[in-house]
């Protein structure tokens, strides 16, 4: 049986703007075969949604909360609306503006 698909929303706090965080997030998501999006918020955080096989989503959550882009400093990452989905709602991973 195929691995269950999972969807999760995220928001990352810390020094995450002006440090290529979105570009690296897009790269890491694509490397894992995940879909979704990422964007900067007006309050200095980075937010988005990621979808894909459960194990890959969990790996991405770990990257978002502990690794980030080389110049970033992550204070914390909040995850919400985590749920199992029957099909992906996006065809790729994109940076939103």
Curated annotation (Swiss-Prot):
Which residues catalyse the reaction?
22, 40
**Sorted alphabetically, which keywords does the UniProt record give?**
Acetylation, Hydrolase, Phosphoprotein
- List the transmembrane segments: none
Classification via PROSITE patterns: ACYLPHOSPHATASE_1 (PS00150), ACYLPHOSPHATASE_2 (PS00151), ACYLPHOSPHATASE_3 (PS51160)
- Residue numbers bearing the N-acetylalanine modification: 2
Q: Where is the Acylphosphatase-like domain?
A: 7-97
InterPro entries according to UniProt:
Acylphosphatase, Acylphosphatase-like_dom, Acylphosphatase-like_dom_sf, Acylphosphatase_CS
Q: Which reaction does it catalyse?
A: an acyl phosphate + H2O = a carboxylate + phosphate + H(+)
Enzyme Commission number = 3.6.1.7
Any one Pfam family match given in the protein's UniProt record, by short name: Acylphosphatase
Q: Which domain of life is it from?
A: Eukaryota
This entry's Gene Ontology molecular function terms read: acylphosphatase activity; identical protein binding
Which residues are recorded with the post-translational modification Phosphoserine?
91
Report the protein's function: Its physiological role is not yet clear.
Q: Which family does it belong to?
A: Belongs to the acylphosphatase family.
| Designated name of the protein | Acylphosphatase-2
């Amino acid at each position: 049986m195929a691995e269950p698909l999972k969807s999760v929303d995220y928001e990352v706090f810390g020094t995450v703007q002006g440090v290529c965080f979105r570009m690296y997030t897009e790269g890491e998501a694509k490397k894992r075969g995940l879909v979704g999006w990422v964007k900067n918020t007006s309050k200095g955080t980075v937010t988005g949604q990621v979808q894909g096989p459960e194990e890959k989503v969990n790996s991405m959550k770990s990257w978002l909360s502990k690794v980030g882009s080389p110049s970033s400093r992550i204070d914390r990452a909040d995850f919400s609306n985590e749920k199992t989905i029957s099909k992906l709602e996006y065809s790729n991973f994109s940076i939103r503006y």
